[in-house]
């Protein structure tokens, strides 16, 4: 049985996208209050883990 482990900030982003459906990186930045450089890394990691996908260039949603 394989479990995916997420950091607190990754969980926060997943929760935001679960509630809102789709958000731009600017909206995620404002709502999460995570620093921009850290948010970019979190979004990349979540994409690599297959949890989120980018949409329309700057948007993100759950996979």
Residue ranges and their predicted role:
Residues 5-34:
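Short amphipathic alpha-helical interface segments
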Residues 50:
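Glycine-centered, phosphate/nucleic-acid-interacting loop/turn motifs that mediate DNA/RNA or nucleotide
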Residues 33-47:
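Short amphipathic alpha-helical interaction segments
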Residues 1-9, 24, 54-63:
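Short, cationic-aromatic polyanion-contact patches
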Residues 16, 39-43, 54-55:
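Alpha-helix boundary/capping detector
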């Amino acid at each position: 049985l394989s479990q995916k482990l997420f950091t607190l900030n990754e969980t926060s982003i997943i929760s935001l996208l679960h509630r809102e459906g789709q958000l731009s990186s600017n909206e995620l930045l404002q709502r999460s209050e995570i620093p921009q450089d850290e948010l970019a890394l979190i979004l990349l990691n979540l994409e690599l883990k297959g949890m989120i996908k980018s949409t329309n260039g700057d948007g993100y949603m759950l996979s």
